[in-house]
């Protein structure tokens, strides 16, 4: 898969700042991929339903080379940090 970066967050909503950070990481760190990891249940935050946030990220990164999204997971009943999703 090459050199990858992991970009986790609530993305509520995903916005240009998120895209700029991910684009900068992709180019400045010479990454092959940036994997976006929307947090299913943010810690100490209320957020839009995970399904909606996941779809918003998918739309935002569509047609952007080097970006992909972590496979959709079932929403947890407890709060999590993005890193816990990967473990």
Predicted regions and their residues:
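Nucleotidyltransferase catalytic core that binds NTPs
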Residues: 1-87
């Amino acid at each position: 898969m090459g050199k990858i970066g992991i970009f986790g967050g609530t993305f509520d909503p995903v916005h240009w700042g998120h895209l700029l950070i991910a684009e900068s990481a992709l180019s400045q760190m010479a990454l092959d991929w940036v994997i976006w990891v929307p947090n299913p249940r943010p810690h100490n935050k209320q957020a839009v339903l995970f399904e909606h946030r996941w779809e918003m990220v998918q739309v935002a990164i569509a047609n952007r080379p080097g970006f992909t999204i972590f496979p959709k997971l079932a929403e947890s009943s407890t709060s999590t940090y993005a890193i816990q999703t990967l473990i």
